């Protein structure tokens, strides 16, 4: 599927590495009012055998991929039994609106499918209309509300599901 992102730059999606954490933490701080800590990511990458994290690296169209292209976005998922639970998705503000979030979500869904997953679930802030629109365009449906889910402001989260 072609996206605007691929018209301006190419995107490679691959597993997150420990050396990506500095860039990931910057994206995290720019994206969320209560960002995850370095320790939280280290715990996910090193200790959680159900966790999978992907990064998107962008580079100019038609150019060979640089050896050290920096991450411009990332997504995480837990695979529990046959269900993928999206833990987080974020794209650097300079790269938003180019389809990178969609590319990451599609890659996460592919990963879950390859590992035998049958469905996906996630929570999204009630006020995050951009993310809700993306998830609906990917086939996610609202399945309920988690009241006061987000600790920073007690905001509700919509629960969304999708069969793969």
Regions inferred by a protein language model and the residue ranges of each:
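Well-formed, non-transmembrane alpha-helical positions, independent of function
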Residues: 23, 133-134
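ABC family nucleotide-binding domain
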Residues: 95-96, 100, 107, 136-138, ...
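Short beta-alpha junctions and helix-cap segments that line functional grooves
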Residues: 41-42, 145-147
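Acetyl-CoA-dependent GNAT
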Residues: 2-7, 15-98, 105-115, 163-164
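Conserved SAM-binding loop
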Residues: 13, 97, 123-124, 142
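C-terminal "cap" of GNAT-fold acetyltransferases
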Residues: 2, 6, 17, 53, ...
């Amino acid at each position: 599927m072609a996206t605007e992102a691929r018209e301006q730059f190419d995107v490679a999606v691959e597993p997150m590495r420990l050396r990506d954490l500095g860039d990931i933490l910057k994206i995290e701080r720019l994206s969320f009012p209560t960002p995850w800590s370095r320790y939280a990511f280290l715990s996910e990458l090193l200790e959680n055998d159900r966790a999978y994290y992907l990064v998107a690296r962008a580079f100019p169209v038609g150019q060979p991929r640089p050896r050290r292209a920096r991450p411009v976005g990332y997504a995480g998922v837990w695979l529990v039994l046959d269900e993928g639970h999206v833990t987080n998705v974020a794209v650097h503000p300079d790269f938003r609106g180019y389809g990178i979030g969609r590319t990451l979500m599609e890659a996460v869904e592919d990963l879950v499918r390859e590992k035998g997953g049958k469905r996906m679930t996630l929570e999204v802030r009630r006020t995050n209309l951009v993310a809700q629109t993306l998830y609906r365009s990917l086939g996610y449906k609202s399945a309920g509300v988690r009241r006061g889910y987000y600790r920073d402001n007690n905001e509700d989260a919509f629960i969304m599901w999708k069969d793969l």
